[in-house]
Amino acid sequence: ILDKEGEGDSLSVESLNGKYTINDILVTSNNDKWINISRPTSQACLTVVTNSNSLDEATSYEFKNFIDTDNNDFSPNNYTCMAEDKNGYIWIGTNKGAIYLTNPKLATTENNQSMRCTRVKLINEEGIPYYFLDNTIITTIKVDNGNRKWIGTDGSGVYVLSEDNQEIVHQFNTSNSPLLSDKIYSIEINENTGEVFIGSDKGLVSYKGEATKGKDDYSDVY
C-alpha cells in the first residue's frame, strides 16, 4: 500500500492468507474495503476490511453465507462482482444471481456468518412473483446517476433495473440491440454524459444513457 507521500507499507489480512483469486475490490463511501474471493470454490467468500486511521488498526471480517428476506439460505459457489448504489446498499453478483445488503455495516460484526440479504423479486405477466435473474451468472454490476443498476450476465446480455428495484427498465441482448454478444465481461458508465460502455467476448459497444451527473452550481440556469 502506498501512502500520500509515496511510502510503501503492507497490510496483513488474516482472512486473505492462502487465498488464491481476488477478482474484485470495492471501496465504499465510508472507506470500507470489500474484497471478493472467487476461486477455488472451497474458498469463495467476501472479506471486509474496515475503515481505520492507520493500517495497524484495520480489522477484517469474512463471511460466506446469506439468509434472504424469505428466510431462505443463499449460499453461492462463486462471488463475481460488487457495487455500491446511491442509497449505500452493497450489490453482490454471484453464480446464482444478484443480491444486495441494505445494512452493510452488519458485515463488520463478529456474528456475521449468515448475513441478511435482499433478492430482487419481480412479478411476471401472470401475477406470480419470481426472483430476478435467479441462478444466472452475474459478471458485472454498475450503478448510474439515476441509481439504476446495469447488470451484465454470462450469456443473457444486460439488464437495467429501476431505481427502486421494482422493474426491468431495459433488457439488451443480441436479438434486440446492437450488442455484439450476450456474454458480458464489463460495464463502465461516463457519469458526465450518461454514456454506458459494454464489453463482451466479441468487442465493445456503447449506449447513450439518460442519467447524467448533476452539477454543484446551477447559477447559469434561468
Mark where each language-model region is.
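Blade-level signature of beta-propeller repeat domains, shared across WD40, Kelch, NHL, RCC1
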Residues: 96-99, 104, 183-221
